[in-house]
Each structure stands twice: as C-alpha cells, then as structure tokens.
C-alpha cells in the first residue's frame, strides 16, 4: 500500500541562507548540532531565526557560530537569551580537525546554509566549507541560471 506521508513537523527548516550559494562556491557540507538554551529552542520552534550574515569560526579547538540572530522568546521572563550571542557547534573530533585544517591551510570559509530540526526534534545546522566567489564568477552563475530558465521556456513553447 502506498501511503502518502505528510511533512514531518519535526523535520522543518527554520532559517536558510540562500545568499550563501550565490556568494560562495560550496565544496563540502556537514551537519552540526547546536548548543542552545531553552528559550532559544522555543524561539526556533516559532520559526524565527536569521543566519544571513553569520559565519563559523574555529577557536581553541572548538567551532563557534558567530553573528546568528535568534530573537528573544516573548513569553520568557528575565532568564531570556541574548539574540546575537556566539553559539557552540557540536561535531566529532575528526570533523573538527578536517574543518579547521581546510580553513587554515586552504583559505576556505565556514558558511552556515540552514538551521532545521531533524527527526528526533534536535536543532541542527547545515555547515558548508566554501570559497568566496569573485565578481566574474557570480556573473557567470547568473548567466547560466538565466540561460537554463530561457531554455526551459523555449522547450515549453515548442511543446
């Protein structure tokens, strides 16, 4: 029996950095856990977050998410969180070593792509290892996107 599954409410994207794929050449992605307080999780469950200007940094053998914005939870009292605090990312030692090595030696950048809840209801961050694109690379990407869109229109018109 084929059953149509509804979208799992626990597996939802909270915030997405759509500009990252345009500004960076994504070479590798990795899933990382986030160390969050209770009010941060509640704020995320309401779908409020912004990771547009955020990045990850390797400091002291740990990886930190910097400049991400999780607004304060409105129903919280005086124990609310700071919206732009640094958040620690949870990774294995091998994964951390691999990421720190690529950032140090090859001049790559750690860019967050999206924050979401997995099947167990845990907040996860999709982290990309990327190299910044130059202006001509961005123009080339734009040309390819426009051409594929135009090609689709032409094929649709012909039937």
Curated annotation (Swiss-Prot):
Main location: cytoplasm
Highest taxon in the source lineage: Bacteria
PROSITE patterns in alphabetical order: SSRP (PS01317)
Molecular function, one GO term: RNA binding
GO cellular component: cytosol
One Pfam match: SmpB
The entry's keywords: Cytoplasm, RNA-binding
Coiled coil: none
Gene3D superfamilies linked: 2.40.280.10
Location(s) in or outside the cell: Cytoplasm
Swiss-Prot/TrEMBL GO biological process terms: trans-translation
UniProt cross-references to InterPro entries, sorted A to Z: SmpB, SsrA-bd_prot, SsrA-bd_prot_CS
Region annotated Disordered, chain positions: 137-159
UniProt family annotation: Belongs to the SmpB family.
Function: Required for rescue of stalled ribosomes mediated by trans-translation. Binds to transfer-messenger RNA (tmRNA), required for stable association of tmRNA with ribosomes. tmRNA and SmpB together mimic tRNA shape, replacing the anticodon stem-loop with SmpB. tmRNA is encoded by the ssrA gene; the 2 termini fold to resemble tRNA(Ala) and it encodes a 'tag peptide', a short internal open reading frame. During trans-translation Ala-aminoacylated tmRNA acts like a tRNA, entering the A-site of stalled ribosomes, displacing the stalled mRNA.
Designated name of the protein: SsrA-binding protein
The species this protein was found in: Mesorhizobium japonicum (strain LMG 29417 / CECT 9101 / MAFF 303099)
High-level lineage: Bacteria, Pseudomonadati, Pseudomonadota, Alphaproteobacteria, Hyphomicrobiales
